[in-house]
């Protein structure tokens, strides 16, 4: 009887089958007792072997449960023990199952001879980057929902420096850039506010004011894999409308790579080449030790370190005086009797001399004394310090703006675009030279303990976790003014400024400096209990249910700035400072000086003594979350197609409480004729509670061998950013009367979503997929302005509010990846391949600003795409990758109300590695080869300059040793 394939191994989606050595590698198995026909398919997916058997031989048989870590062949023997099936394999890659018959020895020998080939074929072993792609595509294939995966079963095989860069190459995933690094993730055009980040399935604390996870703090060496879940399941934590990003750390008992891996190298940025006395070369180093004490106990210890030196220059507009957008403004004419013309408040140039150090440690322990119990402990610790000198130049603070016509007639040779003043010549415009220093010290600790018990058909898992993140930061500045006779300036897409007197020839009059400290602390404790009952029926395979409790408190110290006054009679001669020119902007020379020396000279020895670590917290949001779920998993046949999926519901109950200071500034006459601005602080608190029911269902239909149709539907939520739940309110002391506040009564974002994915696996590492989705989003949180009379004054207050209407987000995602050997017989192309994806997004959801012409919702990029060309053979691997994103809305800095539009960008990266020996390899990377800047504009008007930053190119070379 001819043999028919009932399952293809999920790791054998390449032209090559899994190598023979692969069959001897221990893996974790979790297969329920069930009919043999479905059991061998589950086994094929989990083992990486190709299984061949006839339907007649499998008919009517039931297999045993297999739970634990075994070699694939040992696991298969346990699976079919007592069933009457026997194993016949020709090369350790393809396994043939037949039902045992009463045969004589001769006929058995004849059968074995017919099955076995005359010669053992040559094995093809796939390692490194290419193996990572194979494993990732295998995980995607076996998952019943819509998801993307990153796999790194061997330490150090990922081509990226941080996991943020790897995530940003997945379909539909984009990353914001900070200090030249990919940082926070957006999924399917929805910004970081609605992305849930987890580590080993656990929600984690963050050092950001909101909930966002900065993925660049996780070095790729400590990550064994990552999953981006785009469709939802009841078993997943609530919180990710756009998706959930889950990083997995190394499980030492399941690890099969080298015991020791050490890596060290240099990182050089070519940005800031004109900055005086600045070394732009840093370093990276890491070491990992995975020790299997015995078959029951193993541990992993990892250490990472990095010093990043990246000098980059930027130019930023300060926004416009425009009462049509901000009702608190008062637009005036620039010529007497003329129409009102919005004018810029000014602009600034900045040079940042980044010097950042990151140290990290990871620990993992896995103990499995028998097949019925497993204990896992893991810990991640990261310490990140920034010491960044900054040179700034602020332009036009005294007469570029024209509030209420106060500077009418001051702008000669005006340039008007779209009704706005974007350029002019002004007399005696103020230039403030700023020598400043930004320091940041933050830490992150993530730890968890998990116990799992397997009792017959029951699996019980208990999990405890704790994470804490802290950040202390302070920005201090020395500020000095001079006034050139004339200044000609132009903003827009090509900003430039010229002055009649260069700053290094001027004498500066110091003004009040600034010290702006901040502090954030986030603590999150959670416990979770999960149970699963396996079934042996023809439809339901298991029932999962569980509960989780989480207690989180995020505290901030805000509004503690000071403004030291300069010493009497002090001046600063520009010639005593170092002058230098920017490479990317046509502006007056920048000035550099010794910050500590200038600080003492201008303000005195102890002028700025603020210690951010000693600041009392004055804004706190606490959150208690109860969650429970039940999910049924099934495996059946639907119209001759195997159908694997789940249906379930998750219930989420949330209580949040915000406590903070409400601040009103007012002028007080402390002595006759001596008026000072003082703040009146009132302690207030408020909160909200709600319960949400979140049903979900998904199914994967194998409509043809290697072809899957996946469907999903769910209701999902994302809790509001924690900083937007603050009760704090701050009001100005004079006109224009403005204020800002959080909103402790915010409801969560909600969405009903549908996902469809067509996936065709047509060869080794070969996939073509098209995914579509629609999300109907309600309770969207945006910033709105309202009027309120306070102390007899009409204030314009800005605060976040929930939208009363819903909107839609829809999109398509295309993925194509393959080695060229699957497309052509041309031998030269055998070791080349391509990875490409394109994401198209459309949404009718708008932010609430600017008035009359609101921006699209944060994160929506109509088009994003990746195109990677790779080569892998004989120990040499190379990748040339291009990444594109169209324009999108983003948050600027830590102010959630500061929305900007990010211009389209294309970046190009290259990486190559060579295995000198099986134990030694070298790697070279070049990032941002096109020196693509980050460019934003404000108020949804392209000519209103926001911020333009040039980070330069990054070059890395390192050495990896494995033994």
Regions found by a protein language model. Give the residues of each.
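Short acidic/polar hinge/loop motifs at secondary-structure boundaries
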Residues: 202-230, 280
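Short loop/turn motifs that connect adjacent beta-strands in outer-membrane beta-barrel proteins
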Residues: 236, 252-258, 293-296, 372, ...
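Gram-negative outer-membrane beta-barrel transporters
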Residues: 772-777, 781-788, 793-888
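Outer-membrane beta-barrel signature, preferentially recognizing the C-terminal barrel domain
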Residues: 435-444, 613, 617-623, 688, ...
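C-terminal beta-signal and adjacent terminal beta-strands/loops
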Residues: 884-891, 913-963
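Extracytoplasmic beta-strand/coil segments of soluble accessory domains associated
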Residues: 95-98, 139, 164-203, 230
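Short, acidic, small-residue-rich periplasmic hinge/interaction motif at the N-terminus
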Residues: 40-42, 46-47, 99-156, 192
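Transmembrane beta-barrel wall of Gram-negative outer-membrane proteins
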Residues: 277-400, 415-416, 442-450, 456, ...
């Amino acid at each position: 009887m001819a043999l028919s394939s009932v399952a293809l191994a999920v790791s054998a989606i390449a032209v090559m089958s899994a190598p023979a050595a692969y069959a001897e590698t221990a893996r974790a198995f979790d297969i329920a007792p069930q009919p043999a026909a479905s059991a061998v398919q589950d086994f094929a997916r989990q083992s990486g072997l190709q299984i061949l058997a006839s339907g007649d031989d499998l008919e009517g048989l039931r297999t045993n449960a297999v739970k634990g870590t075994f070699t694939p062949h040992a696991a298969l023997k346990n699976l079919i023990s007592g069933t009457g099936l026997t194993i016949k394999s020709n090369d350790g890659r393809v396994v043939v199952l037949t039902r045992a018959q009463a045969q004589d020895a001769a006929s058995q020998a004849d059968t074995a001879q017919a099955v076995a080939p005359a010669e053992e074929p040559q094995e093809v072993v796939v390692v490194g980057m290419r193996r990572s792609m194979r494993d990732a595509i295998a995980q995607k294939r076996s998952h019943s929902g819509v998801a993307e995966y990153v796999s790194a079963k061997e330490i150090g095989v990922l081509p990226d420096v941080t996991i943020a860069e790897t995530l940003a190459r997945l379909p539909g995933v984009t990353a914001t850039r900070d200090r030249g690094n990919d940082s926070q993730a957006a999924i399917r055009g929805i910004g970081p506010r609605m992305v849930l980040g987890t580590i080993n399935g656990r929600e984690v604390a963050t050092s950001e004011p909101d909930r966002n996870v900065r993925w660049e703090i996780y070095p790729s060496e400590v990550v064994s894999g990552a999953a981006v879940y785009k469709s939802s399941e009841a078993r997943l934590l609530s919180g990710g409308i756009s998706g959930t990003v889950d990083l997995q750390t190394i499980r030492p008992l399941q690890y099969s790579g080298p015991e020791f891996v050490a890596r060290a190298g240099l990182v050089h940025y070519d940005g800031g080449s004109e900055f005086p006395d600045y070394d732009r070369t840093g370093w990276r180093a890491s070491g990992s030790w995975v020790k299997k004490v015995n078959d029951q106990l193993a541990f992993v210890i990892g250490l990472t370190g990095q010093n990043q030196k990246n000098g980059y220059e930027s130019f930023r507009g300060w926004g416009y005086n425009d009462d049509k957008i901000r009702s608190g403004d008062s637009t005036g004419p620039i010529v007497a009797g003329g129409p009102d013309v919005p004018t810029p408040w000014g602009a600034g140039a900045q040079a940042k001399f980044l010097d950042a150090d990151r140290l990290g440690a990871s620990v993992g322990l896995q103990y499995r004394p028998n097949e019925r119990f497993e204990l896992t402990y893991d810990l991640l610790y990261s310490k990140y310090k920034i010491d960044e000198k900054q040179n700034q130049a602020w332009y036009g603070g005294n007469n570029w703006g024209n509030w209420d016509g106060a500077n009418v007639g001051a702008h000669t040779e005006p340039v008007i675009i779209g009704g706005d003043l974007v350029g002019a010549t002004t007399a005696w415009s103020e230039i403030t030279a700023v020598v400043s220093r930004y320091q940041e010290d933050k830490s992150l600790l993530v730890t968890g303990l998990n116990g799992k018990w397997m009792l017959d058909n029951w699996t019980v898992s208990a999990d405890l976790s704790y994470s804490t993140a802290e950040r202390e930061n302070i920005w201090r500045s020395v500020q000095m003014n001079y006034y050139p006779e004339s200044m000609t300036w132009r903003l827009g897409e090509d900003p430039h400024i010229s002055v009649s007197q260069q700053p290094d020839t001027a004498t500066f009059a110091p003004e009040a400096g600034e010290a702006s400290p901040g502090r954030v602390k986030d603590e999150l404790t959670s416990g979770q209990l999960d149970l699963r009952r396996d079934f042996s029926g023809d439809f339901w395979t298991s029932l999962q249910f569980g509960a989780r409790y989480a207690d989180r408190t995020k505290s901030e110290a805000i509004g503690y700035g000071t403004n030291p006054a300069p010493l009497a009679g002090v001046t600063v001669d520009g010639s005593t400072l170092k002058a230098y020119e920017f490479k990317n902007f046509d502006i007056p020379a920048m000035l550099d000086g010794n910050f500590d020396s200038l600080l003492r000279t201008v303000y005195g020895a102890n002028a700025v003594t603020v210690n951010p670590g000693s600041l009392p917290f004055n804004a706190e949001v606490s959150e208690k979350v109860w969650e429970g779920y039940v999910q049924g998993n099934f495996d059946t046949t639907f119209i001759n197609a195997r159908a694997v999926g789940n249906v379930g519901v998750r219930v989420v109950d949330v209580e949040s409480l915000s406590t903070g200071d409400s601040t009103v500034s007012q002028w007080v006459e402390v002595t006759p004729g001596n008026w000072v601005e003082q703040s009146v602080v009132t302690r207030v608190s408020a909160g909200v509670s709600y319960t949400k029911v979140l049903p979900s269902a998904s199914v994967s239909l194998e409509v043809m061998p290697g072809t899957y149709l996946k469907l999903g539907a769910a209701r999902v939520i994302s809790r509001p950013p924690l900083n937007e739940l603050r009760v704090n309110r701050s009001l100005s002391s004079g006109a224009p009367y403005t204020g800002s506040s959080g909103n402790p009564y915010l409801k969560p974002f909600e969405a009903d979503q549908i996902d469809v994915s067509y996936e065709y696996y047509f060869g080794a590492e070969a996939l073509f997929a098209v995914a579509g989705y629609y999300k109907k989003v309600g309770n969207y949180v945006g910033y709105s302005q309202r009027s309120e009379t306070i102390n007899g004054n009409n204030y314009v207050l800005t605060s976040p509010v929930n939208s009363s209407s819903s909107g839609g987000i829809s999109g398509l995602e295309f993925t194509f990846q393959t080695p060229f050997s699957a497309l052509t017989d041309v031998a030269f192309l055998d070791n080349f391949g391509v990875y490409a994806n394109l994401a198209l997004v459309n949404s009718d959801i708008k932010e609430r600003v600017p008035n009359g012409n609101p921006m699209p919702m944060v994160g929506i990029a109509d088009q994003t795409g990746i195109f990677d060309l790779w080569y892998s053979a004989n120990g040499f691997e190379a990748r040339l990758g291009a990444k594109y994103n169209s324009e999108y809305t983003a948050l600027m800095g830590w102010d959630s109300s500061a929305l900007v539009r990010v211009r389209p960008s294309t970046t190009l990266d290259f990486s190559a590695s060579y295995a000198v020996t099986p134990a030694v390899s070298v790697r070279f990377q070049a990032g941002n080869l096109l020196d693509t800047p980050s460019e934003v504009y404000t108020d949804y008007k392209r000519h209103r300059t926001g911020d333009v930053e040039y980070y330069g190119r990054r070059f890395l070379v390192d050495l990896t040793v494995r033994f």
